């Protein structure tokens, strides 16, 4: 006897498979049933087989198909099937209290897991660390991009992301435990350069989420905070002959959805499930905010300043490293405070803040809302966001730091039996043009601010700066070889990465170098002379005046001379030359400083965010020619702007000057050292 399934929108699908209600493949259906893919969650998950690899989409709680996950858990608890599944995820969604992927952590349900971030699903992490399942931890961006490459039928992904870290096969290949023997990462050589090859993902089922579906399975995402890699995952699973199930809030009439709004076309979708509202929160922290989904822009209100604690001290010092017109990624946790400081100091409008799952611009959110943004300029698909990151699109990144060692390696992914996972950390840290790690100096901090001073209390602490980190999530050696500028900012001191290891460059005023700093470091840092004192403003209540610092660097602060290499640095970043007096002023100051050196120098000039009024081009190039003839043994220039490189190169070449213009400071310096 046919079984009648009444989907939530009242449409009817029939099939004749015994007494079980199962949606049939389209080629077996006819008439109206050919188009109607709406079923219940229980019916959808009954198609999952033992041993299937299930994509569980989500970021914290955004995009997470909770209705489907609960249905799968309930089926297993009632029937004992399906068994031995593989969970595949970029981020293991969760709230650390049992929601998210932790719902699937029953003995026998999972056999394997492949994912980027694990920290929000502690039960899943315990299964992996406890050797109860096979488990790989790969970079979040790599997993995200693998959905796209797997969809295209490629054998995998080739990238430099992960070299020198724990996912490098020379350091374990991302295997979490002894039970895991499968190699998913290979070291390869291309044109004399090392790369990592990540194998395509095994994919049989996808749990995805949208806002609206029509009976044909076309999916829109207008109320979602993120789009993540939903379309890529759906394509990958569909092309593998698998099952794509999408959880939505509502059903629209057939043909009523605008094709421009459809994020997942119906040809990729097998089942649509209308969720109960309580299982379809926009994030795990907020049921719904139209500001997160970009449906409206929130009126900018005054953001309450952070309390003046050691965390604000660190965030303030990190904010001092930001430059106007920079594209920045802020990590979760302490780095979130940098956005608060930027808002308080009125410099948000001069920065483009981003988050790895997709938001571009706006104000990043925090806590269980993390990953979304208010008033963003765009919401990118996650693979595209990581393309932007991996290709060098980030001017700066501020990331957390749980452990660091003498060579500048950083661990944020694993601490004994606790598994956090790498998340997007490896992609971001390896690719940002400037990297700023932030964290308290020891645990617990034992520091507080009183009367404009940092005060250290007595008590037992655990060091965070160790001889060697437990796991290498960031390779200091790789970064140093690439010439990447890296700072390690704490409330007590600031260190920087050098080819020889970490150098202590700043300490907080009033602290004792031996007692308060060196006694709590597991190695002897490089110290050249006396470390500078950290800016006293970061310990003082009230505004620091960071906007003035950001927009108006004094001319005298734009010069530096490296005696050992006879290399002179001129920082023109953010300068605007609008009048002939501006050109004369910079020329006079440069000539004065170069004349004082007493010999010709190797000149390196930073042209990031530089503007020259077109009518001043001849006057400026005449100045450059005069300086080159009298003071330069050689000169190189650099800017991250491809347009500026092209324009400057044309203007100099047309006037008979060799441009020698590069994308990075390191490339410009390397030219002189050949």
What are the roles of these predicted feature ranges?
Residues 56, 87, 330, 353, ...:
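Buried hydrophobic side chains on well-structured beta-strands
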Residues 45, 83, 304-307, 312, ...:
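Glycine-rich phosphate/ribose-binding loops and adjacent secondary-structure elements
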Residues 76-81, 345-347, 597, 628-629, ...:
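Short helix-capping segments at alpha-helix termini
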Residues 23-35, 51-62, 403, 564-584, ...:
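Acidic/glycine-enriched edge-of-secondary-structure segments
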Residues 113, 556-674:
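Amphipathic, Lys/Arg-enriched alpha-helical "gate/interface" segment within cytosolic domains
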Residues 2-46, 60-76, 88, 94-104, ...:
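Conserved phosphate- and dinucleotide-binding cores of soluble alpha/beta proteins
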Residues 33, 85, 110-112, 242, ...:
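Short active-site oxyanion
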Residues 42-53, 147, 201, 317-327:
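Glycine-rich phosphate/diphosphate-binding loops that line cofactor/substrate pockets in enzymes
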């Amino acid at each position: 006897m046919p079984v009648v399934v009444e989907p939530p929108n009242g449409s009817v699908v029939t099939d004749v498979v015994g007494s079980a209600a199962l949606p049939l493949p389209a080629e077996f259906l006819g008439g109206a049933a050919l188009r109607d893919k709406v079923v219940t969650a229980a019916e959808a998950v009954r198609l999952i087989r033992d041993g299937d690899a299930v994509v569980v989409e989500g970021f914290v709680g955004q995009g997470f198909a909770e209705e489907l996950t609960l249905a799968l858990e309930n089926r297993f608890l009632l029937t004992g099937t399906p068994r031995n599944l593989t969970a595949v995820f970029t981020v293991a969604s969760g709230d650390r209290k049992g929601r998210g992927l932790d719902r699937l952590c029953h003995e026998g349900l999972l056999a394997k897991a492949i994912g980027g971030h694990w920290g929000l699903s502690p039960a899943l992490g315990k299964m992996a660390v406890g050797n109860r399942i096979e488990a790989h931890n790969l970079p979040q961006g790599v997993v995200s991009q693998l959905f796209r490459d797997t969809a295209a039928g490629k054998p995998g992904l080739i990238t430099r992301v992960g070299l020198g870290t724990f996912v490098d096969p020379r350091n374990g290949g991302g295997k979490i435990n002894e039970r895991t023997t499968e190699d998913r990462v290979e070291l390869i050589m291309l044109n004399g350069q090392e790369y990592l090859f990540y194998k395509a993902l095994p994919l049989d089922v996808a749990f995805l989420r949208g806002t609206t579906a029509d009976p044909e399975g076309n999916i829109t995402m207008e109320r979602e905070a993120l789009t993540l890699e939903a379309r890529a995952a759906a394509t990958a699973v569909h092309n593998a002959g698998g099952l794509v199930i999408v959880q939505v809030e509502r059903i629209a009439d057939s043909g009523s959805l605008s094709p421009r709004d459809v994020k997942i076309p119906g040809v990729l979708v097998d089942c649509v499930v209308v969720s109960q509202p309580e299982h379809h929160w926009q994030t795990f922290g907020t049921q719904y905010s139209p500001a997160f989904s970009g449906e409206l822009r929130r009126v900018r209100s005054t953001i309450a300043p952070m309390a003046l604690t050691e965390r604000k001290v660190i965030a303030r010092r990190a904010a001092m490293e930001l430059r106007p017109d920079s594209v920045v990624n802020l990590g979760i946790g302490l780095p979130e405070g940098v956005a608060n400081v930027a808002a308080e100091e009125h410099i948000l409008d001069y920065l483009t803040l981003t988050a790895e799952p997709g938001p571009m611009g706006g104000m990043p959110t925090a806590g269980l809302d993390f990953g979304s943004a208010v008033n963003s300029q765009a919401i990118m698909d996650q693979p595209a966001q990581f393309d932007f990151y991996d290709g060098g699109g980030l001017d700066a990144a501020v990331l957390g730091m749980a452990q660091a060692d003498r060579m500048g390696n950083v661990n944020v992914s694993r601490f004994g039996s606790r598994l956090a996972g790498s998340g997007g950390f490896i992609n971001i840290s390896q690719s940002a043009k400037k990297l700023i790690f932030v964290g308290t100096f020891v645990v617990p901090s034992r520091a507080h601010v009183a009367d404009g001073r940092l005060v250290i209390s007595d008590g037992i602490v655990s060091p965070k700066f160790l001889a060697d980190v437990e796991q290498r999530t960031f390779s200091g050696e790789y970064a140093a070889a690439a010439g990447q500028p890296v700072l390690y900012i704490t409330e007590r001191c600031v260190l920087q990465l050098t080819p020889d290891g970490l150098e202590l460059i700043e300490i907080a005023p009033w602290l004792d170098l031996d007692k308060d700093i060196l006694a709590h470091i597991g190695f002897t840092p490089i110290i050249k002379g006396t470390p500078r004192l950290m800016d006293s403003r970061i310990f003082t209540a009230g505004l620091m005046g960071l906007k003035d610092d950001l927009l108006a660097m004094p001319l005298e602060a734009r010069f530096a001379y490296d005696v050992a290499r006879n290399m002179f640095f001129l920082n023109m970043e953010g300068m605007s030359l609008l009048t002939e007096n501006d050109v004369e002023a910079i020329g006079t100051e440069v000539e004065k400083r170069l004349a004082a050196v007493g010999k010709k120098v190797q000149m390196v000039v930073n042209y990031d965010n530089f503007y020259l009024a077109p009518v001043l081009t001849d006057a400026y190039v005449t100045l450059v020619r005069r300086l080159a003839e009298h003071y330069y043994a050689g000169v190189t220039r650099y800017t991250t702007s491809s347009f500026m490189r092209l324009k400057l190169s044309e203007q100099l070449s047309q006037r008979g000057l060799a441009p020698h213009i590069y994308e990075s400071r390191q490339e410009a310096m390397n030219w002189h050292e050949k």
